[in-house]
């Protein structure tokens, strides 16, 4: 008899983490999920209602600021997925990150995430967990000067430049990834890092409808103003949440996988995104038209991402599926 493998998802109630939990259960894994409070009535019941959860999901309380709180959740698991490193846009006092100096930005925005990630990795190492997959962001992959097609190996953001521009939230991902890579190398861990941005598709917790693209798409469906008053001269990178979860599992399941992987399907200019949305929602409130020539969309080299072997929905499909799902929700109208 083959024993089921166990995995741990840190940040199980997050947008990404909850989808990894769902995908892991569907693949037959025993899943340990961590939340700050595993009894939270606004979070836990929605995870416990997932297919397969009754027999294969256990929830644990853990806080990334406290390394030892992860010991129980990590005991006996084969891989830990770290999906709790959400962007921080303000410090404990509520002061916006963009108003901080470097000392405060590092102390209150960057280092809590870096130290939290390392706490989880130290706990995993202590429990003998050799496989780690981290959810980061494409914000760590913007080199200067910009390149036409960026890749995960050569192209990094400059954290000093990010801090100089008061982009401490973005710099957090850059600093965290480098620290995690160093720790993994020193402790013989196989580390993969997924780099997503705009995440579309069904959400698992109702609270996730209050932010993310699902919120402004719901507004458009209801005839309200959406995200922009005017089409921005910029692009947006996108992926379906189910495909992103599949990439996370593939990075774990492929023993040759390690390093950074883009977690996006592609990037479209906002002008093209709104054109597609208007095709799907002919009565929607369109933002004011772009007046200037559109800048090129972000270009990617997807060689490494494609090596994981996951088929991804294209942008028209992920937009349509997200809109159809929102329309079917009883609270949309």
Placement of each model-derived feature along the sequence:
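A conserved pocket-lining segment of Rossmann-fold NAD(P)-dependent short-chain dehydrogenase/reductase
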Residues: 160-166, 199, 206, 212-239
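Active-site Tyr-X1-5-Lys
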Residues: 162-192
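NAD(P)H-binding glycine-rich loop region in Rossmannoid oxidoreductase-like domains
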Residues: 37-115
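Glycine/proline-rich active-site loop of Rossmann-fold NAD(P)-dependent oxidoreductases
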Residues: 186-189, 201-216, 250-261
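Mid/C-terminal beta-alpha module of Rossmann-like enzyme folds, strongest
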Residues: 233-235, 245-294, 322-333
């Amino acid at each position: 008899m083959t024993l089921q493998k166990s995995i741990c998802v840190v940040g199980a109630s997050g947008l990404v983490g909850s989808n990894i939990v769902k995908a892991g259960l569907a693949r037959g894994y025993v899943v340990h999920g961590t939340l700050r409070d595993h009894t939270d009535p606004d979070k836990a019941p929605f995870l416990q209602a997932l297919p397969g959860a009754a027999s294969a999901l256990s929830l644990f309380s853990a806080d990334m600021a406290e390394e030892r709180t992860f010991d129980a959740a990590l005991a006996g698991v084969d891989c830990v997925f770290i999906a709790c490193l959400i962007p921080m846009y303000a410090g404990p006092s509520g002061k916006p990150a963009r108003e901080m100096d470097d000392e405060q930005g590092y102390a209150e925005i960057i280092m809590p995430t870096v130290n939290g990630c390392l706490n989880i990795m130290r706990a995993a190492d202590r429990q003998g967990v050799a496989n780690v997959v981290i959810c980061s962001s494409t914000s760590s992959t913007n080199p200067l000067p910009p390149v036409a097609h960026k890749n995960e190996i050569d192209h990094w953001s400059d954290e000093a430049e990010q801090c100089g521009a008061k982009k401490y939230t973005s710099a957090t991902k850059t600093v965290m990834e480098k620290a995690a890579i160093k720790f993994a190398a020193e402790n013989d861990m196989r580390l993969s890092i997924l780099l997503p941005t705009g995440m579309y598709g069904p959400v698992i917790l109702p609270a996730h409808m209050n932010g993310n693209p699902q919120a402004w798409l719901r507004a458009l469906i209801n005839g309200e103003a959406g995200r922009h008053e005017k089409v921005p001269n910029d692009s947006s990178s996108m992926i379906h949440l189910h495909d992103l979860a599949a990439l996370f599992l593939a990075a774990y399941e492929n023993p040759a996988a390690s390093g950074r992987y883009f977690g996006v399907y592609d990037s479209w200019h906002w002008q093209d995104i709104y054109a597609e949305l208007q095709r799907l929602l002919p009565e929607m409130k369109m933002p004011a038209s772009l007046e200037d020539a559109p800048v090129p969309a972000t270009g990617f080299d997807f060689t490494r991402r494609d090596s994981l072997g996951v088929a991804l929905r294209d942008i028209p499909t992920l937009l349509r599926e997200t809109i159809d799902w929102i329309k079917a929700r009883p609270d949309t109208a």
